[in-house]
Curated annotation (Swiss-Prot):
This is Terpene cyclase janA. Belongs to the membrane-bound ascI terpene cyclase family. It comes from Penicillium janthinellum (Penicillium vitale). It is found in: Membrane. One of its GO terms (molecular function) is isomerase activity. Part of the gene cluster that mediates the biosynthesis of the indole diterpenes janthitremanes such as shearinine K or shearinine A. The geranylgeranyl diphosphate (GGPP) synthase janG catalyzes the first step in janthitremane biosynthesis via conversion of farnesyl pyrophosphate and isopentyl pyrophosphate into geranylgeranyl pyrophosphate (GGPP). Condensation of indole-3-glycerol phosphate with GGPP by the prenyl transferase janC then forms 3-geranylgeranylindole (3-GGI). The lineage of its organism: Eukaryota, Fungi, Dikarya, Ascomycota, Pezizomycotina. One of its GO terms (cellular component) is membrane.
Amino acid sequence: MSQTTTAALISLSVFAAYAKYYQSFQNGFIALLSDMADTKSLSGLPGGLHCEYTGFAPLDRFLTACNIFFWPVFQGEVPNLSLYGVAFASALVPMWLVIVLETHRGRRPVAALMELAFLAGPLVQCLGPGLVIPAILSRLPMSTPGTKLPFGFDIGFYPSSMIIGYILPLILAALPTPRVTAYEAKQQLIAVWQGWPVYTSLIMLIIHYLRPMRASQDWQLKIACAFAFACSTAGHLAFLWFARAKTASYHVFLPPIPWRELQVASIEAGVLRFLQWDYTLSASAMLVWTVASYCRATGKRIGQSSSVILIFGMAGVVFLGPCSVALLLYTSVALQRKGVTNYDCCRSS
């Protein structure tokens, strides 16, 4: 990876610490969260905060804080916030796929999955994708054409692991209260969902042992990428449609300028601002990394790209979502690696 790309990714991670955390102290968002924790309250539910989940005090405090933060997103009383959460959650599917694939490069599957389950995944959930994903991408190598695809297990089961370990807990946590689930049960479901990196990694590890790799690598990659692309694009289009149908302001896609912010008026406004920075910075990091990888694989410089490609890329970011475009670039590079490998093998024979 070039020094420029590494510096750009690290800069995004450092800026995330400033925009997300420092400014959250300055604009009063952290104080609002602390007040709700002190009064054991949730947004719109005074005195209804559940504080015991595992019996392990540090973990219980973390899960309690997660419930205070995510409750407005899952409750659905602020449509803009909930729909933005859907778009962000769907964009995490291709982000995580790229991280899973590249973490396996030159690694044993067990070691790679353990790193994802107990290091990278918990950091993403604890500190946020906007801060952690740029840092993870900054240490991932960029391979050149001719390199084998970066996994030694059936990545075609990535969709199954994400559906069971990520999407299903997400849907259950989003069930309406009190019509379908009780308030306490919803908080427990939100707490359960926080462990999705562990669940998905363990599911892939179990499949690795129970079902040896059978399908070709390029076919597995196509299955996993098609699933991730569908998730990301569907979430982005749903939010676009809602913003259009409800005449919502399109500025909801982008976070406010941090040094011009006012005090947050509500917990919902603070959560939306926090998620906006998380999504914007993590998606930007994905685009930076995949564009750099594409340029390295094709031997092109960014300035040498045609204006038509740039226009289509910008249109794709708007109408498909930034992570969908990043995944398309990554897939083209990965399949090119596979194709070049096969081509070289044919030539040598």
